[in-house]
Amino acid sequence: MADSTAPDISRPFGYTASILAALILVGIALTVPAVVDGRPVLFALDWAPSLGISLAFMVDGLSLIFGLLISGIGSLIFLYATGYMGNHPQFGRFVLFLFAFMVSMLGLVLARDLITLFLFWELTSITSYLLIGFDHNNPRARRNALQAMLVTAGGGLALLAGFILMGTAAGGYDLAEILTGPGLQDSSLYGPILVLVLLGAFTKSAQFPFHFWLPNAMAAPTPVSAYLHSATMVKAGVYLLARLHPALGGTMAWSVTLATAGAVTAVLASVLAMRQSDLKQALAYTTLMALGTITMLLAGAHPYALTAAVTFLIVHSLYKASLFMVVGAVDHGTGTRKVERLGGLGRAMPVTAAAAVLACLSMAGLPPMIGWIGKELIYAGAATMTGAPLVIAAAVTANALMFAVAGVIALRPFFGAPIATPHVPHEAPWQMLAGPAVLALGGLVVGVLAQPLLGSVVGSALTGSLLQDRAAGLHLWAGFNEAFVLSMLTFAIGAMLYAMRDRFATLVDPVLRRMPSLDAGWDSFLDWFRDLAAWQTRMLQTGRLTAYLMAVFAVVAVALGATVILGRPEIALEFPRSTFLWLTVGFTAAGAVVALNTHSRIAAIAGIGTVGIGVAVIFIFAGAPDVATTQLMVETLSAVMFAIAALRLPGLVERRSRQRQLAHGAVALAVGLCVTVMVLSVTASPLDRTITQYFEENSYVLAHGLNIVNVVLVDFRAFDTFGELIVVLLASFGAYAVLKRKGRAGA
């Protein structure tokens, strides 16, 4: 945290980033008329045309809402960060990381094809890791940043597999074609696609059982928490669910999975939020509640449920960013975020108190805030879903607990008798007040003018992106109906929970203590994984070259064997009639047997040389004298080099057990058999003579050479041959250096 009065040359970075984000906001806002009119704004740049992949972007109703929230709140966050930590010695680096994260989020929500979306999806994981672990001297920050990245990156791997399967099933990666094309639900790949996509979305948006990483991410500086947990990273998962709803939604598997995960996350997070004494931690759990609610609503297929999901997304972004910045201002002005150590701050911090009260009114769902409309829509949408009674019960429970938490955040710190704090309470600098004040007032203004300001934008998201025929209206008064009754019930239960919060803690704490900790489970999993990696390293990294070759050839044998078994290749066997050729084969095999069984290095070298000479003779029989000559030269040179080296080495001693010898022999036979079968299969296949004919016709004309093999090696493939020569030359230098050093050591 920074002393806002201290001058620092890094502060202009924060102001510049805020202005740039505001300009991006204006640019996106200019697309509103076209998007509302049903004309998405498109941009594409060929990236890998041969693979059907382009760097494509699109501004439609859904991406418009996310783009406005990301850039608008981002502009205020940069300004807030300038006041909060503007004189931090690494503030410039912080701004760079935060701006890179904002660009990554914008790329994610504006992406028009799956590959582009995944690229920016992974960039958000990387940049959020840098932000959460910004205080890299703090072990807790490093640990929690790594946890967040591993969980979300693990989900990202699943998501990549899901996208590849989706592109295979749909015949391309273009989102517009996937969403409007034939239903993926009828594809045999729908099940795997759904599982993989939901894994990616649930890990990113911290849905149960992957919710544990999000509260730990509070180790980040407050500007990061305010941005990541309001409109950006944690919303990426629900954005993906909303974006793919037309293609994957509407099935029982989709509805049950999303409704269950969302409801469990919302209720559990609301209960945990009530038990937090740190204001920042309480807000983290309320973020989980909001994400669970949105996920639960996206399980539905009715326009009311989807309108509620989109509207509540906006509601949560406005009040949550404001409240996180309020908590940072309280921490700045008092030196603590603990609820029990705060009280009566309204007099010393009137602007902060006003912003907190307005934002908490929206969080509690009270009129005339936009939160009231969002809560009414939640109940209206829940009533249209499969298993409506259970969904409504979960929504009422979560919202009532949120009402109580909002009461704690709004009333306990700012009203009542003053309580002594580590610092004399004082208002934060203007940079830290602008953001929470603007967003809190925005929740009021948008609530009063919801339909004129948001109706067409939300409607375009429903009709243009989610492919619904209509959207629900956004009205402060929708009549005396079921949603209104449920709202009154929510207020009554919430007020009771606030008044009985100590009794609530007495009832809930024993249950929570008996519940298994997924965070501790994650640590146990990492410990087990490290032990597994250490065991694997001990098994494979033995320091013996034979063990490494054994592992490589075993994998090759399995891969080739699977290819042979599954491919069922056709084999044409034609045995030679030449007695001399059979004698050569026997001579070659005898050399291999000698090399394997001798205890003399010289004899082993002679055996290997015999194999090489035998192969050269076979080349002569095959009509390739040039290749045979090359083979003889290489074998002769190799034998001489090996013999020179062998003079400096001790004799061979067999240290392998009988079992290891048998294993090595089995792998060698398996590789040899598979390679033989594949070579026979290739020779039995029709030969495409196009390249051969080209060399025959052009070797003399273009290269003026009569020997086609030589021309291919030194003219047509000159660079390949040159590269091979360099490799051999470098290897000889290395061997010479080793032998020379060995000789000096012996001297």
Residues covered by each model-derived region:
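Transmembrane helix-loop-helix hairpins at membrane boundaries of multipass inner-membrane proteins
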Residues: 2-96, 165-187, 191, 212, ...
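Hydrophobic alpha-helical membrane-insertion segments
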Residues: 18-32, 155-164, 357-363, 435-453, ...
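Membrane-interfacial helical/loop segments at transmembrane boundaries in membrane proteins
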Residues: 41-51, 174-182, 375-381, 452-476, ...
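Short aromatic-rich membrane-water interface segments that cap or initiate transmembrane helices
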Residues: 46-65, 181-194, 381-393, 471-479, ...
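Hydrophobic transmembrane alpha-helices and their helix-loop junctions in integral membrane proteins
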Residues: 76-117, 126-428, 562, 577, ...
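Cytoplasmic/organellar membrane-interface segments at the starts of transmembrane helices
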Residues: 161, 346-354, 402, 406-494, ...
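Alpha-helical transmembrane segments and their membrane-interface junctions
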Residues: 362-377, 440-461, 541-567, 678-689
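Flexible extramembrane loops and terminal tails that flank transmembrane helices
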Residues: 565, 572, 576-584, 593-596, ...
